Amino acid sequence: MANEANPCPCDIGHRLDYGGMGQEVQVEHIKAYVTRSPVDAGKAVIVVQDIFGWQLSNTRYMADMIAGNGYTTIVPDFFVGQEPWDPAGDWSTFPEWLKSRNARKINREVDAVLRYLKQQCHAQKIGIVGFCWGGIVVHHVMTTYPEVRAGVSVYGIIRDSEDVYNLKNPTLFIFAENDAVIPLEQVSILIQKLKEHCIVNYQVKTFSGQTHGFVHRKREDCSPADKPYIEEARRNLIEWLNKYI
């Protein structure tokens, strides 16, 4: 079974040919990609990378999509200058690579990003969205930072520990039915534990026939059968942010 200490490999999927609408900035000790909302509503969303890093065009595309819905978005380099995973890399070395990129040891970076959003972007309401590795970050943040009003964890691997179910604010979990990284058994455990321990609003949604990465690493035009699920998941993501931020 996949878990945070021994995850299964995931394919990069379709790398989008996308330039981006934002700009790269320095946020204290880390770099970040920031897109300002065309409407200054005092709302911001932290968008967390997958294992392929903060410069992946697909993640920036998602950040810009969210920004177009009224949020200033920021994609921080949560690897803090360390190299992202190489899609052509030897997966046998992945566990060792991951040791220095612990998705639950990012509080210093989160603190810096929150200061930047409040001081430089005048954000008063903040949410977070993350994909794959970033989905784990979202789960951690939503159990640690009460000031983050809403979270969307997209195919983030689940750790079975009591402390990860005490969510501080509403969180949406998106999974894929045919995910080789996250078995449905893990999703079922998450649902059961949230029922037992969570007192805030949450939703766990599994998309039929989809695979790991379908929300942000699969082109909408790649398969007519997949397109409705991709669009629905992205719509659900935006709706969750709109409802709770």
Swiss-Prot record:
Q: Which InterPro entries match?
A: AB_hydrolase_fold, CMBL, Dienelactn_hydro
Chief location of this protein within or outside the cell: cytoplasm
User: Which residues does the Swiss-Prot or TrEMBL record annotate as the active site?
Assistant: C132, D179, H212
Q: What is the lineage of its organism?
A: Eukaryota, Metazoa, Chordata, Craniata, Vertebrata
State the protein's purpose: Cysteine hydrolase.
Query: Which compartments is it annotated to reside in?
Result: Cytoplasm, Cytosol
Q: Which family would the database say this protein is a member of?
A: Belongs to the dienelactone hydrolase family.
E.C. number, please? 3.1.-.-
Q: Which GO terms describe its cellular component?
A: cytosol
Asked if the record carries the keyword Acetylation, the reply is: yes
UniProt name for this protein: Carboxymethylenebutenolidase homolog
Question: Which GO molecular function, any one, fits this protein according to its record?
Answer: hydrolase activity
Tree of life domain: Eukaryota
Q: What SUPFAM superfamilies does its record include?
A: alpha/beta-Hydrolases
Task: Please verify whether the record's keywords include Zinc.
Answer: no
Q: Which residues form a coiled coil?
A: none
Positions of post-translational Phosphoserine modification: S223
Q: Top EC class per UniProt?
A: hydrolase
Residues carrying N-acetylalanine: A2
Pfam families associated with the record: DLH
TM spans, by residue?
A: none
Q: Which UniProt keywords apply?
A: Acetylation, Cytoplasm, Hydrolase, Phosphoprotein
